[in-house]
UniProtKB/Swiss-Prot annotation:
The keyword Membrane does not apply. Its main location: cytoplasm. The gene is deoC. Catalyzes a reversible aldol reaction between acetaldehyde and D-glyceraldehyde 3-phosphate to generate 2-deoxy-D-ribose 5-phosphate. Keywords: Cytoplasm, Lyase, Schiff base. Gene3D superfamilies: Aldolase class I. One of its GO terms (molecular function) is deoxyribose-phosphate aldolase activity. This is Deoxyribose-phosphate aldolase. InterPro entries: Aldolase_TIM, DeoC, DeoC/FbaB/LacD_aldolase, DeoC_typeI. PANTHER family: DEOXYRIBOSE-PHOSPHATE ALDOLASE (PTHR10889:SF1). The active site is at D91 (proton donor/acceptor), K153 (schiff-base intermediate with acetaldehyde), K182 (proton donor/acceptor). It catalyses: 2-deoxy-D-ribose 5-phosphate = D-glyceraldehyde 3-phosphate + acetaldehyde. One of its GO terms (cellular component) is cytoplasm. GO terms for biological process: 2-deoxyribose 1-phosphate catabolic process; carbohydrate catabolic process; deoxyribonucleotide catabolic process.
Length: 223
């Protein structure tokens, strides 16, 4: 697989709590230069970033991030606000407390409400696979499918582990037709990226792939 084809799947990501505007600018410049799928950045930078790229790059942001236990109303507001400010894609975090309580209906209803707030913008649902049993992940594949979301996403990159090949294999087997897969967190090589794509991921959330291409990768990057 050619590097340029891998790059087309990448949501070039900077979600560090201390991210500065010059660092965000670098993410945006690199994402445009290497023609990635999007740049994924904190919501507080969306308006400025959207003005900066002026339609040349899709802007992705996160809501309910990274823990997911804010209220549905708060997440809906975050979504609407991000879209108003120029976000093209939304990555939301589900409420894992509902999952652990076995309340999958509430999880599904929340995703439905946020998808309605997204209108025709892309919605990716982060399920935080490192915190799930295999049975919970299988159930959530059905929940995300029924909710009308566009993607199921493995990880925030802020928990105990990121994407694994096994997680993506399970998603590819159990998610419904029309729902795509985003692998995120800890994707540390072009070889891993290619494997995730081969297993069924059509998006990769990472900050490292462009750095690898530019020979700038460091072992301290978690996302």
């Amino acid at each position: 697989m050619e590097v340029k084809d891998i790059l087309k799947t990448v949501d070039h990501t900077l979600l560090a709590t201390t991210a500065t505007w010059p660092e965000i600018q670098t993410i945006l410049d690199d994402a445009m230069a290497y023609e990635t799928a999007s740049a994924c950045i904190p919501a507080s930078y969306v308006k400025k970033a959207a003005e900066y790229v002026s339609g040349k790059l899709a802007i992705c942001t996160v809501i309910g991030f990274p823990n997911g236990y804010s209220t549905t109303a708060a997440k809906v507001f975050e979504c609407e606000d991000a879209i108003k400010n120029g976000a093209d894609e939304i990555d939301m975090v589900i409420n894992l407390t509902d999952v652990k309580n076995g309340d999958f209906d509430t999880v599904e209803e929340e995703i439905r409400q946020i998808k309605a707030a997204c209108q025709d913008h892309i919605l990716k649902v982060i399920v935080e696979t490192c915190q799930l049993t295999k049975e919970e992940l299988i159930e959530l594949c059905g929940v995300v499918t029924r909710s009308g979301a566009d993607f199921i996403k493995t990880s925030t990159g802020f928990s105990t582990a990121g994407a694994t090949f096994e997680d993506v294999e399970v998603m590819a087997k159990y998610v419904g037709e029309g729902v795509k897969i985003k692998a995120a967190g800890g994707i540390s090589s072009l070889e891993d990226a290619e494997t995730f794509i081969a297993l069924g991921a059509s998006r990769l959330g990472t900050s490292r792939i462009i750095k690898i291409v530019k020979n700038e990768a460091t072992k301290t990057d978690s996302y």
